[in-house]
Amino acid sequence: MTAPDQVARPDGVSAGLPRRDLRQVVATLSAAQITSWGVLYYAFTVLQGPISADTGWSHVAIAAAFSGAQVVNGATGIWVGRHIDDYGPRRVMTIFGLLAVAALGVVATAESFWVFAAGWLLAGAAMAGSLYPPAFAALTHWGGPDRVRALTTLTLVGGLASTVFAPLTTSLDQAMGWRSTYLLLAAVLLLAVTPLHWWGLAKPWTPSARHRQPDPALDVQDGPVPEPDADAPAWDPWTVTRSRPFVLLAFGTSLLTLATYALVVNLIPALVDAGLSPGVAAVALGLGGVGQVAGRLGYARFAAATTPTGRLVMVGTATAAATVALAVAPPVAAVVIGLSVLLGLARGVYTLIQATAVTDRWGTHAYGRLSGVLTAPSLVAGAAAPFVGAALAAVLGGWTGAFLALAGLAAVGTLVVACSSPTRPSARAARSSARS
């Protein structure tokens, strides 16, 4: 059902909400995302050490539980995307937000490691309905022609989650311990985020049609888009997920994600091992976050001047080159900080490239389904990233070899995504073929 002021196209694709309503949705999701990311993700980076010190569980085991959550996140996200396509984000984000509250309750009260790990697996399922992918699906559907601006705003605010919640979590842990901290953060989710999802997302939703013709306004060939034939066959989203371009895009972006986050997670220990002080290493990582914000601020202009595959190749190339430079650069603060900012810039752009990868190639139809499948391998890669980075350093004799190997992964990922552009014959070519 659609409201009178929301245009619904005959093919089941929403033309977007009125701008006032869209601004309300962006504000709702921005507040929910900064809180959900802070509680479900960044709080763990602060509390991992205190948890190990209090319980005696090893850092590796605790990190493995958290990585397991990311794997469950990726697997559950496929179902979440399909549900959002059909019913909208309100119900699923509210229910999964409540699941997050319950999961953190299990984590906070666990007396055995296996109960703790089970709590994180539940939290991983909750992440699938609470973090960026469902929010991206909502704004892609409701944003209409303003969706890139809406997505940019969301990621700018969401990017502040670590800035807000890392020091907050540290203070809470020092005052009351990690268990009470998680219980308090769970209460924040319950009292703040759940109402935002339930009341702030109560907007009309046009269910995605199961099958329809490709969108004639779609940039599927990294260039001018031909009109499809009027009698062109309809397509199914799952046909797209089995296509060569989709598979290559999923594989290539998972390699880029693995390289990017293995570098970020291990940046501070690598810089300290190279001879820099922990303070300088922390500044380098923090200013990389500034670069990330700058990349997101400039994304709309960058996207307007590039093609979908072209910008992904540029970001992948920049990531690989900066990683090589970081591997061989002398441990000079100014040099390291400059490279960290460049890598942050690439990460900021990459987040929005991931958010728009489906719409840039296949349109807004079935965005939730396609995005859920596309991002699942990247989520698994991100979960493995900390272990992959550390393992490479151990096998290759240090962080220089590890960073060069990660640069190689980024380069391979870039080559793969360069071959991922979808194509289809133009209507003119089809008509010429028919006449001949």
Predicted regions and their residues:
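Extracytoplasmic
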Residues: Q24-H59, G77-V80, A166, L263-I268
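Extracytoplasmic gate region of multi-pass secondary transporters
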Residues: F44-Q48, S243-G286, V290-A294
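Conserved MFS/SLC helix-loop-helix module at the cytosolic interface between two early adjacent transmembrane helices
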Residues: A75-F113
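Helix-to-loop junctions at the C-terminal end of transmembrane segments
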Residues: T76-G88, G295-T307, A393
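Intracellular juxtamembrane helix-capping segments at the cytosolic ends
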Residues: G129-G143, V349-W362
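Helix-loop-helix hairpin linking two adjacent transmembrane segments in secondary transporters
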Residues: L154-T206
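C-terminal transmembrane helical hairpin of 12-TM major facilitator-type secondary transporters
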Residues: G288, Q292, T306-A357
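A late C-terminal transmembrane helix in Major Facilitator Superfamily
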Residues: R361-L396
